[in-house]
A protein has these predicted regions:
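Acidic/histidine-rich alpha-helical segments that form the ligand environment
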Residues: 18, 53, 57, 77-126
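Conserved alpha-helical segments that form or flank metal/cofactor-binding pockets of metalloenzymes
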Residues: 36-72
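Helix-loop segments that flank and shape redox-cofactor active sites
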Residues: 3, 18-43, 105-120
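Short, contiguous alpha-helical
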Residues: 50, 123-145
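Short, helix-capping/interhelical loops that line the mouth of catalytic, cofactor-
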Residues: 28, 65-87
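Amphipathic alpha-helix face/heptad-repeat signature
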Residues: 4-18, 44, 95-102, 128
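Long, well-ordered alpha-helical segments
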Residues: 8-27, 58, 102-112, 135-140
Length: 145
């Protein structure tokens, strides 16, 4: 159970960082296709934001505390921090990479939840994977010439 709890905490922190980055990109994107990027980034950050509490509740269901300090979240997160404000297409490329990182965290937690026969959590994680695969498709499609 400890491995599953740790995997969920990593997923929580990674999702939190993913939310912060995608929201930051949403408010800072500029360029000729501003509206298109702005709306896509809004979809991404709203989904990540909506799931912060849901992931936290899953951790609490496992009878553990949720990381809440920025220091702890940044140490657990697998999403690299944004050091500057890139151009719009670079934002999309970075978020495509970050989305795969989030998916890896979900798959790790899913594998452990399956071993623990935590089927409600398994179902939730499968739904999250489906949503992130959809975002990968949208982000990849945006990068096509």
């Amino acid at each position: 159970m400890d491995k599953l709890i740790n995997a969920m905490k990593i997923y929580f922190a990674t999702n939190f960082s993913y939310y912060t980055k995608s929201h930051g990109y949403h408010v800072n994107v500029v360029g000729p296709d501003f509206y298109q990027y702005h709306k896509l980034l809004q979809k991404v950050y709203e989904d990540a934001q909506e799931n912060i509490d849901k992931i936290a509740e899953e951790i609490r269901t496992l009878q553990s505390v949720v990381p809440f300090s920025m220091d702890r979240i940044s140490k657990l997160s697998k999403v690299p921090d944004a050091s500057d404000t890139p151009k719009a297409l670079e934002m999309i490329k970075e978020l495509l990479f970050d989305t795969e990182v989030v998916c890896e965290c979900i798959r790790d937690a899913h594998s452990l939840a399956t071993e623990q026969e935590a089927y409600g959590l398994v179902n939730y994680l499968e739904a999250r994977l489906d949503e992130h695969y959809r975002f990968q498709w949208m982000l990849r499609s945006t990068l096509e010439p």
